[in-house]
Swiss-Prot record:
Coiled coil: none annotated. [4Fe-4S] cluster binds at C80, C86, C89, C168. It catalyses: uridine(1939) in 23S rRNA + S-adenosyl-L-methionine = 5-methyluridine(1939) in 23S rRNA + S-adenosyl-L-homocysteine + H(+). Residues 5-67 form the TRAM domain. The lineage of its organism: Bacteria, Pseudomonadati, Pseudomonadota, Gammaproteobacteria, Lysobacterales. This is 23S rRNA (uracil(1939)-C(5))-methyltransferase RlmD.
Amino acid sequence: MARSRSRIDRTPFQTEILDLSHDGRGVARREGEGGKVTFVSGALPGEVVMAEQTARSRHFDEARTVEVLKASPQRVTPKCPHFGTCAGCVLQHLDEDQQIVAKQRVLMDNLERIGHVKPGTVLAPLVGESWGYRRKGRFSVRRVEKKDKTLVGFREQDPRFVADLSQCLTVIPEIGTKVEALSTFIESLDGKRDIPQIEFIAGDQAVVLTVRHLQPLSDADRAAWATFGQQHGFVIYLQSGGVDTVQPLDGQGVPLSFRLAPWDVELAFRPLDFIQVNAKLNEKMIAHALDLLEPGEDERVLDLFCGLGNFTLPLARRVREVVGVEGDAGLVARARENAERNGLANAQFFSADLTQDQRSTAWMRQGFDKLLLDPPRSGAIEVLQQLPLKQFKRIVYVSCHPGSLARDAGYLVNEQGFTLVSAGAMDMFPHTAHVESIAVFEKR
């Protein structure tokens, strides 16, 4: 919905916060505005705040907290000096234990409101380290003439702007403590205006920075990047266009992988591949999912949206056979290599667009005992509507968006005769409003 900025009234107003929205903002209903909903950034339920309007629309307004008049007992002092400007985090002002409670509430609300379902059991939330956990991400880069410097960081609350960061406390320290050094370094380059973003990713062996550049780098800049990488412990890759243009600066690069020790599995990946950002919680999540799936040693399991084999290969240690299906052909190729590297001949992989008709494919016609799926934010409704669901004794659904999970849960329960046995939130992204969750379904 389009926002109107022409009618914004900047006069601070007092309001009481009634709830927390799915994106981490306080929810208020303004008197004198017909009880119109206003989403207030930086405010918590139970608080009374002075707020300033930032956007208007027909059905709701938006505002930011100017002053807290009555604070929630759950309010804490944010640890990061950039909180409130940088949009990388939105919940640092809320007690950590209460953050996951809020996410659990968002999940249950979505299941009831969108899917019209309730889990038989609410699973205890899965939590881990809350600082220095993020091993993959993307920094925006922008030369700002008014500040006479190059900014490196996440977007601000107003996404038109890049946050001026000196550090990031949620990113692994190998990267998060060096944001200011990266900013200063890029400012010294000839091509400082031609770098729009830098992607970072860490494996067990190395930390890689992939530098997106719009113009060819000068020889001096290439040499400078090489020196910067050596000084700060980064392996530098360059990207001049699409994913297929990514090349190591030194022409050799470095092998990247991470180990899943509980299953004696090592997963190799490339600098722009998808991996779960939170390494420790990823291990907890895999163990949790496998426990909930209850795989038998003589069973065949289907793993949809399998990526590099994050769930597939640990499953292969537990079952007779597992089949992984993924839409990204490059990830499928690496999943096959990972299976071979780990000596797992009982893991098969197929490349398929799971939003399209797959009913005539070889993998779809195979028989399975159980299903595990970890779809993108859009969910899995297209493939669920094609699968012969009656064959699955149990389904474990890992979700990165509670709304799409709720929709798909409604389909499984209300149209396909499944029971939502249990569901719960997982705090993959502490201090953000992102809700990762898991749900278990059984055929009635």
